[in-house]
Amino acid sequence: MSGGGGSQSSLRRYLGAIKDTTTVSLAKVNSDYKELDIAIVKATNHVERPSKERYIRAIFMAISATRPRADVAYCIHALARRLSRTHNWAVALKTLIVIHRALREVDQTFHEEVINYSRSRSHMLNMSHFKDDSGPNAWAYSAWVRFYALFLEERLECFRVLKYDVEVDPPRTKDLDTPDLLEQLPALQELLFRVLDCQPEGAAVQNHIIQLALSMVISESTKIYQALTDGIDNLVDKFFDMQRNDAVKALDMYRRAVKQAGRLSEFFEVCKSVNVGRGERFIKIEQPPTSFLQAMEEYVKEAPLAAGVKKEQVVEKLTAPKEILAIEYEIPPKVVEEKPASPEPVKAEAEKPVEKQPDLLSMDDPAPMVSELEEKNALALAIVPVSVEQPHSTTDFTNGNSTGWELALVTAPSSNEGAAADSKLAGGLDKLTLDSLYEDAIRVSQQQNRSYNPWEQNPVHNGHMMHQPFYASNGVAAPQPFQMANQNHQTFGYQHQNAGMMMGPVQQPYQQQQQNMNNPFGNPFVSNGNPQQPQGYNPYPRYM
């Protein structure tokens, strides 16, 4: 079995040497960066021994700040490609060592280039799936390689948060304020956790390449711990002035620092036992006092009350009266504040009358003859009030021999005669004057409709809606005084009507409509019986 295992390991070494030689030959023929590619291949070959220093220096020269950024980007890409394609623990570990040394020894521009490369593409240091199953020892080596890659990845993240390298620059956590402490201390504690994960176990303890990488991790762990110690001391000094949320975060950091201090002491003891980091100066780890931890926990429990007391004190300071010099100011008397009266309602401003546009054609002006006629009609319709109202007599008209209500009104004795005499038209108008008024009204209305607006067409009226001036309602009986007053003129109306039918021509329907439309007292919705029947001129159509 042992002979078979030795032959397999020899075969793997032989195949690894062939791969390295082939890669170097291809780089000499096809690569634009021949020297850089050859240095990368020889610095990360399959030989299970530390790399030669001259090849590592050649790589550092290619990624220095004086070189073009294209050369730096190509070198990072070549290292990432070499790391992602290999399944050999020696090649992977040597590549990680080159990157680690470059982070420590090259300027900070290399940090920025690696971070930008990891953002633009997949994380070049992500080796969570790396595994070398060539043998039992290779399994142990592969596990340590994965932890080492996590440490380097966290180192870049810590550099991004702190904006400086802990290994190269002195720690700055001693003078930070509370917000910066709460941001930077978690990054340092996470980096210290990755350091503690690099503790070797099993076969990895005796491997020379792993011991070389572990020595660099130990040297950085002391710097990380010093930065954390300064930050924790600064945090404790500001703890009792923090708000509750910040105090809870600070208490969690302090608890984490206590645990990390114990684990870091064990880590240093293991490294000393295997003679790793003999040239390094191990620092003494001091445990934070547990009594102080209890005081911090009690403060966090009472933090809301303390915050309230402080808030009241701040309010009292803000509301305290300010001192005023008597020379410059005089103390005004106390004035009782009166409630302001309710505002008076705002009066709405009257809108300005809109000026009408002048009627140049005088289409809206009423005719002068029409206005004069209206005045005469108003005078004619004025009713003289009766001073003494006589009682009406109730006479039984059913006992008479008359057959019509008109005859009964004439023959029956009534006390309304006096009232009819008193209810004459004002001004002493007689029948002829009243007839002339009717004729003038008809003539003026005809002239107005024909000549007042020459652009307006004559409307066509319905024959069933004809009416005359002073035409009473067709469905309601006239008042009794008007009936008695006009009974004497009944005979004259009949005679005038018969004469018109015998002598005059048939009146035109339109003229009859014009006459009937001039009566504002007529009912326009009552039919006129037989509108098509020709009629003569009748100034008293109501008494037909």
From Swiss-Prot:
Q: Name one GO biological process term.
A: clathrin-dependent endocytosis
Query: Native species of this protein?
Result: Arabidopsis thaliana (Mouse-ear cress)
Give the top-rank taxon of the lineage listed in the UniProt record for this protein.
Answer: Eukaryota
Region span, Disordered: 338-361
Q: Which residues carry this modification: Phosphoserine?
A: S342
The UniProt keywords, alphabetically, are: Coated pit, Cytoplasmic vesicle, Endocytosis, Golgi apparatus, Membrane, Phosphoprotein
Main location (coarse class): membrane
Q: Which GO terms describe its cellular component?
A: clathrin-coated pit; clathrin-coated vesicle; Golgi apparatus
This chain belongs to the protein called Putative clathrin assembly protein At5g35200
The places in or outside the cell where this protein is found are:
Membrane, Clathrin-coated pit; Golgi apparatus; Cytoplasmic vesicle, Clathrin-coated vesicle
GO terms (molecular function) for this protein are:
1-phosphatidylinositol binding; clathrin binding
Q: Where is the composition biased (Basic and acidic residues)?
A: 338-358
User: What residue stretches are annotated with the ENTH domain?
Assistant: 28-166
Q: Which SUPFAM superfamilies match?
A: ENTH/VHS domain, GAT-like domain
* InterPro entries in the cross-refs: ANTH_dom, ANTH_dom_sf, ANTH_N_plant, AP180-like, ENTH, ENTH_VHS
